[in-house]
Amino acid sequence: MKKRIIAAILVGMMIQSYSCKDSSEKKILTKEVTFTKEGELTLKKATTDSVVARLDIEFATSEYETQTGLMYRKSMQPNRGMLFIFENESQRSFYMKNTEFALDIIYFNSAYKIVSIQKNAKPFDKSSLPSQAPAKYVLEVNAGQSDIWGIEAGDVIEFSKNSE
């Protein structure tokens, strides 16, 4: 009888310590980041110089901004994008960690020409999505937009920053 009481007390203590442990672990919630228009970007066909799209854009220039990109956002309107600006032209590779919606990732060289496009990058995918040539600028837009616009390697961008 005493053994059963002791066993019951031990089981009760284990259950209580386990339940206390669970309640002390807090889930960290991240607040969704909202879009802030910081400039405008125009995509043009290289062969005709015709405008295929005009976008409101956010810039990613700091290390934090380039590491975070469009993470923790639920969606983005089709006329928006994020332009990553790097100090030099180099091989680039992006991934979709913590990115909740599919993207087209468009790589540009220092002459503002498309060098490659990674289409329909899957949400939360940690696979490497490299440029096919050195890039200085990278534009992230909603998946499928590059096909809708009919852009390809050699097409160009122009962009401007809002005056502060």
What are these regions (language model features)?
Residues 1-2:
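N-terminal secretory signal peptides that target proteins for export/translocation
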Residues 5-13:
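Sec-dependent N-terminal signal peptides
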Residues 21-164:
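Compact, glycine-rich, soluble single-domain proteins
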